[in-house]
Amino acid sequence: MLNLGQVKVLEEKVAKAVHLVQMLKEENAALRAEIDGRGKRITELEQLVLXFQDDQTKIEEGILKALNHLSTFEDSAYGEALTQHAAKVLENREHAGLSEELTSRTQMEIF
């Protein structure tokens, strides 16, 4: 048979166990709330990453577009410079040809 001391010890142990279970339930609830909060934060961060990736893609496209425009401009400017140079060369040749023709005509008129 149980004596009064054993019952009190058992009662204290049960009270401690109930208290421990209650503390563990509270801790569990707090941890679940923390997990939920962190899950929401993860979702927010994932959305930020997607937006940054989208922005990065747009930036890269803009840079490539600008480089293409610059390349087109350079090609145009280079082509124009070549055209001007070729025109000057032809002009110089024509001028030289006219000078030679005038010189030879002058020489022929002298004789």
Swiss-Prot record:
InterPro entries in UniProt: Cell_div_ZapB (IPR009252)
Keywords: Coiled coil
Name under which the protein is recorded: Uncharacterized protein TP_0847
Domain of life of the native organism: Bacteria
Pfam families, sorted: ZapB
Positions in coiled-coil regions: 4-51
GO cellular component: cytoplasm
One record GO biological process: cell septum assembly
